[in-house]
């Protein structure tokens, strides 16, 4: 878990989600393994309430000497009525995948945009970070 505190009293929390199946090996003799994981960055207020989030999901292959991201996707949530997702995208390069999102906060004084990104990476031995 990674936590970053912001100047306005809010903070972001990034976690790797473990609910996805780990290794999918096509054959017991296969030298290349496949792993799918997701990683989420939550934007929370000082009380710990999730205001919005962005998730990157990546599928990787690895063989002990190299690793590669073969596909990725992103998702967003904005459970707070004061927040809405303005834009979101994802990209992959080598053994990493990144999701980027911008959310808009609406208050009585107007609107303000906040941006976050989350990157997931797989090592040659299948360690996801």
Where do the model's predicted regions map?
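Short, cysteine-centered beta-strand-loop-beta hairpins and adjacent loop/turn segments enriched
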Residues: 33, 43-51, 104-115
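A short hydrophobic beta-strand element
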Residues: 35, 95-105
């Amino acid at each position: 878990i990674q936590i970053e505190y912001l100047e306005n009293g809010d903070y972001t929390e990034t976690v790797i989600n473990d609910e996805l199946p780990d290794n999918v090996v096509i054959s017991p003799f296969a030298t290349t393994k496949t792993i799918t994981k997701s990683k989420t960055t939550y934007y929370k207020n000082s009380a710990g309430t999730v205001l919005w989030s962005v998730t990157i999901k990546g599928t990787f292959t690895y063989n002990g000497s190299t690793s590669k991201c073969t596909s990725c996707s992103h998702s967003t949530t904005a459970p707070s009525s004061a927040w809405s997702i303005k834009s979101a995208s994802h990209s992959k390069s080598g053994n990493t995948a990144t999701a980027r999102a911008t959310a808009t906060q609406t208050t009585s004084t107007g609107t303000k945009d906040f941006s976050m990104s989350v990157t997931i990476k797989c090592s040659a031995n299948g360690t996801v970070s």
